[in-house]
């Protein structure tokens, strides 16, 4: 199958540091190539992939301080993908809804994975304007606020099976927080929980420009407390050890989380999770197996002992059963195949030398003059309810 993957140019594929969407695009591309598909990736020029790379900018836009507006780069990327669209059987978009107006006439050879929150009221109006666009959610909770869009599947994220090795005996003795420092991620809750249960907390997280004031005013003063260590943003090489050595991952979010990639990254390391019941969390965490889902800081403090007692071998086993990139890729291939079957034209009649009489001017003229039809000419099909012509 000839497949185009269109990724956000904000980060490289895979990202150097933080970037959940770009990671998933990378895992999907690599698995598709490994399975023998012809894959083209539209992404930033500093991306690394086994697929054919079509660069849409020199480097990831987040790393280029000269970039003040990302929209021109998205427009250029959509134009390039549209001009090349005939080369592909399927175009798989991971860029929200930017491409909808451009690819509307090609809707059935596109699919769009929604990676972000979908509870914003204006999105309902947008999807109502593009009812033909096939969409994929990454959790059922993500799509729950929407009515009307054309969902063709739900595909939870997956990781390469051997990306993160399990650590069956956590050596670090600390709790971990991994992700972004932002109001909705509630690292302040993680600090409160760790302090209450008397365990060290290590925080590996990035701070976006938009959240710098929040970090400076609200979070930085909390980092001076005993047992709290802020590491900053880490890369994939450091992630395995950071999560594997942790006794548990804290995920105290306060927003409608579409999936929560860090949850399955921790599970791949054998590390259990303590997560707040928001968004897709209950779909990802198997209660009492890979972690515990709680409603409040107080409940989290009470449950920490149960989380630490979970079997890390079983946590890893459940990851392998539910959240591998191979499973994710098979799910997407099933969706591609279903879309292509719908897009394929109706099968033509069995090959024959016969023609429809009135479609050839010379034959039609002969009929008008009373000239008999040859045997390899079929009279036009009668309209419904009219008698069919009989051969004598």
Language-model segments: what does each one mean?
Residues 1-373, 380-382, 389-392:
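Catalytic cores of nucleotide-sugar-dependent glycosyltransferases that transfer UDP/GDP/TDP-activated
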């Amino acid at each position: 199958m000839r497949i185009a993957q269109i990724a956000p140019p904000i980060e490289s594929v895979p990202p150097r540091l933080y970037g959940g969407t770009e990671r998933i695009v990378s895992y999907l591309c690599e698995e598709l190539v490994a399975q023998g598909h012809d894959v083209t990736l539209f992404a930033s020029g500093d991306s690394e992939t086994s697929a054919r790379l079509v660069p849409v900018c020199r480097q990831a836009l987040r790393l280029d301080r000269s970039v003040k507006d990302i929209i021109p780069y998205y427009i250029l990327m959509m134009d390039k993908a549209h001009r090349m669209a005939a080369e592909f059987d399927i175009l798989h978009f991971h860029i929200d809804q930017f491409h909808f107006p451009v690819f509307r006439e090609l809707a059935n050879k596109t699919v769009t994975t929604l990676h972000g929150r979908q509870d914003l009221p204006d999105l309902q109006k947008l999807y109502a304007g593009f009812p033909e666009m096939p969409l994929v959610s990454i959790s059922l909770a993500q799509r729950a606020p929407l009515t009307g869009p054309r969902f063709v599947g739900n595909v939870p994220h997956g990781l390469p099976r051997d990306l993160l090795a399990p650590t069956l005996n956590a050596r670090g003795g600390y709790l971990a927080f991994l992700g972004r420092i932002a109001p909705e991620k509630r690292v302040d809750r993680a600090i409160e929980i760790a302090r209450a249960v008397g365990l060290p907390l290590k925080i590996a997280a990035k701070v976006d420009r938009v959240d710098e004031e929040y970090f400076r005013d609200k979070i930085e003063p909390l980092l001076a407390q005993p047992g709290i260590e802020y590491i900053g943003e880490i890369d994939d090489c450091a992630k395995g050890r950071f999560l594997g050595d942790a006794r548990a991952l804290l995920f105290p979010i306060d927003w409608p989380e579409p999936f929560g990639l860090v949850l399955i990254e921790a599970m791949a390391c054998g590390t259990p999770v303590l997560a707040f019941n928001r968004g897709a969390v209950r779909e990802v965490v198997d209660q009492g197996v890979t972690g515990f889902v709680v409603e409040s800081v107080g409940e989290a403090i009470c449950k920490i002992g149960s989380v630490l007692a979970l079997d890390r071998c079983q946590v890893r086993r459940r990851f392998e059963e539910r959240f591998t990139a191979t499973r994710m890729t098979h799910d997407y291939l099933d969706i591609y195949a279903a879309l292509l079957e719908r897009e394929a034209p109706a099968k033509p009649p069995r090959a024959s030398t016969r023609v429809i009489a009135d479609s050839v001017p010379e034959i039609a003229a002969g009929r008008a003059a009373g000239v008999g039809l040859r045997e390899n000419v079929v009279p036009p099909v009668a309209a419904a309810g009219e008698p069919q012509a009989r051969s004598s």
